[in-house]
């Protein structure tokens, strides 16, 4: 599968494989947040685009584009700097590249998952990048007028990953009683009993080793009886970095 970032002369996008760590997860007691495998997988499930410069924004609350003030005093010599184009407190960051995916694949684009910035939130979009010759922008919406919000140079400002076009349309969702799937119901009941017993044991006598304080069934990809759930269970992603160089 291909994912290419085509660049024009002077474009130097700062793209890296997404980082799995988050400062707030580091700060949880014993970094326990990393025990949640879905969080860690989501954090690293794609690529990040980094800010080309340090800047700060403040929205004065009006709908006009001029109501968003952008301080570029620390932007240095960055050629592509954030702008206020759309109004309503929306900050626009240009992506220096035309991204091209294999046929039938879109890109999901937003801010880094499980990462929070006080006073501003990333917007999300899905782009048909297998045919479009157009660039796109990463946009953030200020949620707290009157406050300065700072972005550092090389701070992740965009996160993207490929998704198959039409994937959701192929599903026929429904709600059903668990008794409809006898095997699933039995496995769920086994897990529920084991989970209750595990927590009761932890309450009676907590183990000294922090890793023994959680069951790790899902993390290890095993069913309640210890058998593997699937062969391709993922604990860590091995995403390739972008290679090559653009025009000078």
What residues fall within each predicted segment?
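Aromatic sugar-binding surface patches on proteins
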Residues: 132-139
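Non-catalytic terminal segments and appended small domains
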Residues: 1-132, 145-150, 156-248
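Active-site-proximal alpha-helical scaffolds that flank and shape metal-associated catalytic sites
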Residues: 115, 139-140
């Amino acid at each position: 599968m291909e994912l290419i970032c085509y660049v024009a002369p002077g474009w130097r996008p700062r793209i890296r494989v997404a980082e799995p760590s988050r400062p707030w997860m580091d700060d949880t007691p014993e970094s326990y947040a990393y025990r949640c495998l879905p969080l860690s997988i989501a954090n690293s499930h794609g690529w990040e685009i980094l800010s080309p410069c340090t800047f700060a924004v403040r929205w004065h609350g009006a709908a006009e584009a001029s109501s968003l003030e952008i301080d570029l005093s620390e932007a240095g010599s960055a050629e592509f700097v954030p702008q206020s184009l759309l109004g309503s407190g929306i900050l626009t960051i240009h992506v220096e590249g035309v991204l091209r995916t294999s046929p039938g694949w879109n890109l999901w684009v937003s801010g880094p998952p499980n990462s929070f910035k006080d006073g501003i939130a990333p917007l999300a979009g899905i782009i048909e990048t297998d045919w479009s010759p157009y660039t796109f922008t990463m946009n953030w919406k200020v949620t707290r007028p009157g406050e300065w919000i700072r972005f550092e140079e090389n701070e992740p400002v965009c996160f993207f990953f490929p998704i198959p076009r039409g994937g959701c349309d192929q599903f026929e969702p429904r709600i059903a009683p668990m008794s409809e799937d006898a095997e699933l119901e039995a496995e769920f009941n086994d897990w529920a009993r084991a989970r209750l017993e595990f927590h009761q044991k932890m309450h009676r006598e907590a183990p000294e080793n922090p890793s023994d304080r959680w069951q790790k069934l899902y993390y290890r990809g095993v069913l309640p009886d210890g058998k593997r759930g699937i062969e391709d269970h993922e604990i860590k992603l091995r995403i390739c970095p972008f290679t090559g160089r653009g025009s000078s």
